[in-house]
Amino acid sequence: YVYSYDELKNIKDIEKFFDIRPEGNWEGKIILDELKVPNEEIIKKLMEIRMKRKKPFFDKKNQLDLNCLWVSSLVSLNSVLPNEGYLKQAENFYEKIEKNFCSKNIFHSYSENISFIEDYAYLIQCLLDLSDSTMNPKYRISAKKYCDEAIKKFYDGNNKIFQKNEKRKNDIFMKPIDISDNTLPNANSIMLINFSRLGFIDQAKELSVSLNGYLNIYKNFMVSSLKAL
């Protein structure tokens, strides 16, 4: 998105449309600052320069947790615009998720050997959202099944909290836990809400006590946990 003066100086009349100087306007390079809307010929020349460059990395992998969040978003949108077909889109999209991510084991992305607690958390959440909106019992049945799986695979019974990775016998050094909100609400908060929605009262009580303990230290990073509690 930046250019050198040498790249631009031979484009006819470019100085009429952009403020370009030999010394540049950002660390010796030029960020194009429009003086007026450029014509198609100028844009074509600029694109020709850019097409010769190495393109930035683009992450093409699909993630289960993000796709499930999209389903929940469609369900929420349906509650506001019920006649626009968003609920049907959500159901169709979930069918693709089930086919591509859940046909054998739950997996996070392209590797069928890896899954994380956030995958289960958001999968269960989207199933419960679909269940509440469609009243189709199959979604709630699946949500309960995956919740049981999540407890078996990720729940640390000693610390009363979900760890990020699956429990394995070779957990030697550390067991990372997901309690802080980053780009998404943390998985333990989502699982606490899932427990409550499914009627897993004992599990919800146990997890809420653990999250409340972490809140005393990390409350600035656990906004979603406050909501869950």
PLM region spans:
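Glycan-recognition and catalytic cores of secretory/periplasmic carbohydrate-active enzymes
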Residues: 1-229
